[in-house]
């Protein structure tokens, strides 16, 4: 199998085997039913993962987690991604919403929401995207108005994975109508029974069977108990939450791409053209080699970003966001490219449902768009790099290595 354990600890290698055993136990019919939209949400999959103690790996043991590092979660997510990015997303949702609860939640919130989330007893969803804004998060139009002891929430979120079935939602609403977006938003935990309406379940190219919905809040009332973090402090929560959102997407993309590539490699040894296996043709075999190298490079970047996230948990001055953005952008782009190559390798049969390549391809397309499109990732990366380069440097100034004449004559900046 195309995997690489040189980046992993002994415990993480053992975890990989645990997750592989679990993945092998998943009924293939579940994947087919999800793709036919015959399943609202893979609830039993989550419960089985919880029973195997594979949910919420990073969270404290007192809430049902295993207190493992980010690198361990990357290992698990790559293996779950083998099933496709739909189930990878389902698995990752516990990590994403759980992060907000673990990092910013109160003791009551952790007990009420985090413990049953990790235990597979409650389903969650996160509401970010709105009809008028996806990447422009701070332009949110959902409002939360304080009336007495209650917050009254009005607005809607769309493209919410698990929106149809979730027991509770982590949503962001504007709490200061006059303030700038980054100082005017507050997160809330809203339980479905509080009056959340599911108004549409979307038909999607991929990621089917996920109950992806538009959810509407009409005078939904919550108390301060359900507020996450400080009033108008949503930017702090959001910026932190982008780490689990993007890292989980990156790791899942590697697993999904690896699956497609492995299928194509096996096929290329059996399929013959012009009297020989198609793997004999260098045009094909060189592309396979390039894809393997790119997946290894993507994995190395994902693990580097995960180590940065682990370091940030111990030392607040560490900021992992640039590396996380790089990992999400690179891994999902390479994932999409790799699955396309797998389909091309298999020719016409790769385009049919005889093999799962076409499903994996449809799933992988979304990964380059959600949790911040890859164009947004590049904006974030360049911003961080230019900001970093503006600081005093202790490195050798390589620009001074040119000949004196060239320095004076050729280096024109304006």
Describe each model-derived feature in a short phrase.
Residues 1-83, 87-88, 104-109, 116-121, ...:
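Alpha-helical interface subdomain recognition
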Residues 53, 76-81, 173, 190-195, ...:
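Short Ser/Thr-interspersed hydrophobic loop/turn segments at strand-loop and sheet-helix junctions
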Residues 120-128:
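A short, Trp-centered hydrophobic/proline-enriched beta-strand micro-motif
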Residues 125, 141-143, 150, 168-172, ...:
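Conserved hydrophobic/aromatic beta-strand scaffold that supports enzyme active sites
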Residues 132-135, 159-162, 178-179, 204-211:
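Short Gly/Pro-enriched turn/cap motifs at secondary-structure boundaries
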Residues 139, 195-223:
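Flexible, small-/acidic-enriched active-site or ligand-binding loops
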Residues 150, 154-198:
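A short core secondary-structure module
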């Amino acid at each position: 199998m195309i995997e690489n354990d040189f980046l992993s600890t002994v415990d993480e290698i053992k975890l990989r085997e645990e997750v592989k055993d679990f993945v092998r136990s998943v009924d293939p019919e579940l994947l087919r039913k999800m793709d036919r939209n015959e399943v609202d949400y893979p609830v039993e999959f989550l419960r089985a993962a919880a029973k195997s103690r594979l949910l919420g790996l990073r969270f404290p043991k007192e809430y049902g987690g295993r207190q493992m590092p980010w690198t361990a979660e990357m290992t698990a997510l790559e293996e779950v991604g083998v099933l496709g990015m739909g189930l990878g997303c389902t698995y990752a949702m516990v990590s994403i919403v759980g992060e907000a609860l673990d990092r910013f939640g109160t003791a009551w919130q952790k007990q009420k929401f985090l413990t049953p989330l990790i235990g597979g007893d409650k389903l969650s969803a996160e509401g970010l995207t709105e009809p008028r804004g996806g990447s422009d998060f701070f332009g949110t139009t959902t409002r939360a108005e304080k009336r007495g002891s209650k917050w009254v929430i009005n607005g809607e979120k769309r493209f919410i994975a698990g929106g149809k079935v979730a027991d509770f939602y982590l949503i962001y609403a504007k709490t200061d109508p006059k303030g700038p977006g980054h100082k005017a938003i507050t997160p809330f935990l809203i339980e479905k029974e509080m009056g959340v309406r599911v108004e549409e379940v979307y038909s999607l190219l991929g990621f089917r069977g996920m109950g992806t919905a538009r959810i509407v809040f009409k005078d939904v009332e919550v108390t301060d108990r359900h507020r996450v973090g400080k009033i108008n402090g949503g930017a702090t929560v959001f910026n932190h939450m982008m780490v689990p959102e993007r890292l989980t997407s990156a790791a899942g993309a590697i697993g999904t791409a690896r699956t497609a590539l492995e299928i194509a490699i096996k096929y290329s040894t059996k399929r013959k053209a012009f009297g020989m296996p198609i793997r004999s043709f260098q045009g094909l075999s060189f592309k396979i080699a390039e894809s393997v190298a790119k997946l290894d490079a993507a994995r190395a970047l994902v693990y580097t970003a995960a180590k940065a996230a682990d370091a940030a948990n111990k030392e607040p001055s560490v900021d992992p966001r640039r590396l996380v953005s790089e990992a999400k952008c690179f891994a999902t782009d390479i994932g999409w490219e790799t699955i396309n190559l797998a389909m091309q390798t298999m020719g016409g049969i790769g385009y049919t449902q005889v093999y799962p390549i076409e499903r994996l391809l449809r799933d992988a397309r979304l990964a380059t768009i959600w949790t911040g499109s890859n164009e947004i990732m590049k904006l974030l990366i360049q911003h961080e790099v230019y900001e970093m380069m503006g600081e005093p440097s202790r490195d050798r100034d390589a620009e001074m290595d040119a000949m004196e004449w060239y320095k004076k004559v050729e280096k024109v900046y304006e």
